[in-house]
Amino acid sequence: MSLTGFRGLKNNIYDLERVNNLVGENGSGKTSFLEALYLMCTGVSFLTKATETIANHTTKQFVVEGIQAGTKDSNKILVSYKQHKKTHFLNNKKTTQGKMFLKHPICLVDAFVNRVVSGTPENRRRTIDRALFHVEQEYLMEHRAYARCLKQRNKALKDRQTTKQVGAWDESLSIHGEKITRMREKHILEITASFEEMSHLFLGREAKIEFKRGWKGGSLFEALKRNTEKDRALKRTSCGPQRDDFTIGVGGKRAQTHISHGQEKMLSLSYIFSQKTTIEKQTNKNTIILFDETDSNLDEASTNKVIDYLKNVNNQILTATHPHSMLCKKLTGKTIFLKQN
């Protein structure tokens, strides 16, 4: 993997092994390195939508390039950003962001993984979307189509257009929206057994996960019609996939109300790793695990459980941690020391 002009990281070539521990102090570029690999494989950053902010301040451009070995035929992957344009290449041919998601599944554990339990519905929806982008080509198309329709309906509401003009978007919005919600709900059902198994392994307690649609009763089309006057008052669409959510419960109670930060992280990891298992079954591909701030908020016993899990999976792993962390001592692999330019 080679990096040129990516944030504050040095231009360099890195020969990655199966297990790679990125080590450095705060601000050394560990998260940026994970971001670079994620962007190379998926075409997008997990930190920002503003691609121009990733480029080196002097050159205003970057290139991330790598060779994916160990597959039937090695793939050369490249993402470049130049003159305000991002371009994706696979084996020297231009490709699309959607195809990159399908080709290179990633299991991302970022520094805010606790938000699976304690964050907003938007945080949780994003984790489902990332997983489905890797599995369902149709999902990205539906997601984009729904976003376009929602933007137009919300504009009509904000501009105080007539009820008829607002309602003109309801049919297409409901068609795309119901497909998105069905796929999300199906995904949660598919990971449920693995999630319950992982949460028992990590927490030693029974945990349940339940999907909640972003509208009540009947079809989305009916809900949009029923809520038109409410939406006109709010100047936005109040029901649909943008309101989807899921809840996690432990011992019959909502998890975020009565567990510690460490338990939150272990429960969130149970969810992320259950997604990993499901994605691998559905795609017949091993994910790459990117794990930021691996042992943050975890006691020694919990850290050992995570390390044992990572030792026993057949994945390429990149962890980001501090020089004196327990992980560096117990998870054998290549150590990459990082410093910003």
Give short role names for the model-derived ranges.
Residues 292-294:
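Walker B catalytic acidic pair
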Residues 30:
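Conserved lysine of the Walker
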Residues 106-108, 317, 333-337:
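Conserved beta-strand scaffold positions in the cores of enzyme catalytic domains, especially
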Residues 41-123, 132-135, 139, 192-196, ...:
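Nucleotide-state sensing region of NTPase/ATPase domains
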Residues 66, 315-322:
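Structural recognition of the conserved hydrophobic beta-strand(s) that form the central parallel beta-sheet
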Residues 109, 115-202, 212, 216:
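An accessory alpha-helical subdomain
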Residues 1-25, 39, 164-175, 179-288, ...:
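Conserved NTPase motor "head" modules and their coupling/switch loops across ABC/AAA+ ATPases, GTPases
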